[in-house]
Amino acid sequence: MEKSPSYDGSGLVNLIAELERRMTGSSPFPGLEGGLGPTGADTYVLVLFDGLGMAQLEHPDAGVFRTSLFRSLEAPFPTTTSVSLSTVATALSPSRHGQVAHLAWYPDVDLVVNTLKWVTVTGDHVPYDYGGLLPRPNLWERLRKAGLEPITVQPRDFQTSPLTRAIYRGARFEGAWNAEDLVDATVDLAVVPGRLVFTYVPFVDVAGHVSGQGSEEFATAMRAAATIWEGIASRLPPGAALVGTADHGLVEIAEADKVLIRDRRFDGLRFAGDPRGVHLWGDPGLLDDLAELVGGELVDPLPLLGPDPTPEAISRVGERVLLAPPGTAILPKGFDKRLRCYHGGLTAEEVEVPLLLG
């Protein structure tokens, strides 16, 4: 098994804790081992590029990111957007914020839920107290209590989504229509001291999933992300500091390496999680049979989520997690088999993300 991600100094959670410590003097998790360079900024801008792992920095259009690279970080497990964004919104590990998968089992509604869209695997809407998903106070609320203003800059059509209501409780939302708007809004908001401006850029992840990393669509997305980073860095007002990172990397999976689970023997199992790390509940003998069939490794998921798991995290996580072999995706019914790139596992390509300084 690949090693557990870092939660004690080299993880995404530690970057967020480091920023909170700089702005307020304290945070629930340790800050970044080795620090983050000079202190003294009045406002911080944090840009998160969805899907821009360290491996993606090898792309021909990623030169500006290579130039800005300060070090690598480790995304939390599982390496998926809703989990990492929950870590950003709380400065907590998944064990503590309780969001444990892309397709997550919520026992209180007896459903496996797509946590990006808050629908079931068949597409039915799931009503829920989205605003109560994350612990209180979250990062944004702690910043407000300290007299600071947290603001998130996002594509405008995300504003009313269940995920936004869950992740950004307590933060001001500023919508943008396109990449140029993202830059303009971020720069304009950073003029005022005492703010944390969090800008989310989805383009790389979307292009990787839909078209693959060798496509022109992916190259276009990489160029757009690079332009956003350069645009913010070149126009950053005095007194503001620019930091960039990602939520996870991407692994390209060939059609022949997608393992569809359709054997009726396994119908009695519950499946959740991600195609690179499938949460499982059911007969231990069947779990062993499934692992042997796909060539994956069954692991205890709780130690991978971080320290001191809450009752919510324990109730939602699988009895076991089946890690997919390198270069493969495990696809039970309800998992999306159409994608070109996946994530959610523990390989370096999925876990290692950049820490960028502008």
What are the residue ranges of the model-derived segments?
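Feature captures the catalytic ectodomains and active-site-proximal regions of enzymes
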Residues: 1-358
